[in-house]
Amino acid sequence: MYGNPIHPGHIECLMLSKELVDELWVIVNNDKQAELKRGVPSFQDEEYRKTIIESIRYVDHAEIAIDQDGSVCETIELFYNKIKSLDPDSEIIFTKGGDRFANEIPEKVVCDFFGIKIVDGLGLKTHNSSDMVKY
């Protein structure tokens, strides 16, 4: 989740994601990823965004992505290993917002490899962070 800035669409996605799981773990895209996405440095750094995301009531854990490309494949593997070490029988679900679909994301390969279910299209695409930061 870039959350740069957080808007109601992000909150809706988190709320709907939390309805699917006992504990919601959120990946916060890092500063390098934010710059790759927009072509300019993020106006809210990764720690700032992580602090905001952690404060949302639906979120149980948040960590900054370790990936250096635009995906979160390596971070999914890290989460998978952490979660399975805590509860080997837990089902892990990777969720995406209203404008992201499983067959279009690079994370599908790692999710398929680890048997992680993907639930996409969570929430309506009612807001766009890019539009919010334009003057």
Task: Give the predicted meaning of each segment.
Residues 1-135:
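Nucleotidyltransferase catalytic core that binds NTPs
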